[in-house]
């Protein structure tokens, strides 16, 4: 479960980075 949350946060962070660019 914790692994899934970490993966989700990672994706969100990547998405935010792409949006920022």
UniProtKB/Swiss-Prot annotation:
The keyword Secreted applies. It is found in: Secreted. Keywords: Amidation, Secreted, Toxin. One of its GO terms (molecular function) is toxin activity. Expressed by the venom gland. The modification Serine amide is found at residue 21. GO terms for cellular component: extracellular region. Disulfide bonds: none annotated. Belongs to the cationic peptide 04 (cupiennin) family. 09 subfamily. This is Cupiennin-6b. It comes from Cupiennius salei (American wandering spider).
């Amino acid at each position: 479960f914790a692994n899934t949350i970490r993966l989700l946060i990672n994706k969100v962070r990547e998405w935010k980075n792409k949006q920022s660019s």
